Amino acid sequence: MTTTYDDPRRWWALAALGLAVLTLGFDITIMNVALPTIATELEVGTNGLQWMVNAYVLVIAGLMLTCGALGDRYGRKRLLLIGLGLFGISSAAAAWAGSAALVIAARGVMGLGAAIMMPVAFAVLAALFGPAERGKAVSFLVMGLGIGIPLGPIIGGYLLQHFWWGSIFLINVPIAIIGAIAIAALLPESRDPSPRRPDVLGAVLSTAGLTSLVYGVIEAPGRGWSDQVTIGAISAGLVVLTAFVAWELRVRDPMIDLHLFARPQFLWASIAGVLVTFGMLGLLFVVPQYLQFVAGHDALGTGIRLLPLIGGLIVGAPAGERLAARAGYRVPVSAGLAVLAAGVAIGALTDLQSSYGFVAAWLATAGLGIGMALAPAMDAVLDALPTEQAGSGTAITMTLRQTGGALGVALLGSLLAEGYASRVNTAGLPPEAAVAARESIAGALAAAAPRRDPQQPQRLTTEQSTDLDEGSMKVSSTTLWWYPMGV
């Protein structure tokens, strides 16, 4: 393996990697603030919006471990350049897509590029930095990823305020070009001299199982939970995931070393990380829609009003670390989950008369819980692993968290969609408006908007508009209740 411990260019290479990782982070959530605009522009329902979010995260979760192994075998610099190329090209395709199907497909390819870059970016640090500096370099990349996730809605809001919705994807293109040039010039090639064989079948089984399972969850509100397609998709997903577990237990070089879960600390810390990511990404799917559709804020205003969540996270992270040093990992992780659940439960009390101060308070509370739990949970995972398994154990945890985020969006979004059919009052609306109102929040708010065309005989009344707004608010708050109940 080529090393460049004394090469001053290594810090510039780290900066390029940090920029790429920051982009991967905010691309996980940048879609959320744009969902209302995309729903209107492309006439997309809730199911389609969920797949625009999940296509990216789910591909990352399914392919991250395999892509990391490919980097070890074929060269990490080469894989990084391939990942950046896929990410940049698919971002441009998504920006100019004219249909929901094309956006979803492009997001899937973006996820493939991210799945290549995320593990390889961390693995390549071994060729750049010696043991004394490596911890600082790893922290830099982790910080970039952590800041990028909550930063996504703010960047997205600013872009939507000044440009069209495709700009949230187009911003990735120059970053990918700059990153590719910097990596090609500054990064040495490195590979594992004795790499493990890639677990292709394991990757296929895990991706197919998760995709089928989440597809069933997303489709259930529209088709019904007893529908054959819903039952078939969920059942197939569970069967394939069971086969995945059986395969991983017998294959020589498994994608996931399931024996790690026999370590209690690794198990509970991994579950805690999944719960936190589930709640964070699920929250970032539901709340922007409330802020735009119900509270009436524009895209940038929505992003800015999510800042209390980031503020709580920034305060909670060091507090959790200090508490872990004094009382062990379980205390801050358990306390963080409790604070997060409490914040979301308070958020479920939000109604049409709630002030933004109330919303900001419970968002900050939820962010505080996320910050308190997330870093100590990762520290607990690393502490439970022997040194020789630190890399694979970290990759497992990252994959599980990405999967938890995808399921958070799917399950909370599924509950959100299901509520419209039963709780939004469309009595007295014209047939087309009633169908649109039951399909999604975008349709409900479009139907609720007073029609100013004097030639239109079926003008909505103030009472009808209020009923639809209240229906949207009720189903949003009911959806938020499910997270603290689950925790």
Pin down the residues of each PLM region.
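Transmembrane core module of solute transporters
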Residues: 10-60, 144, 164, 171, ...
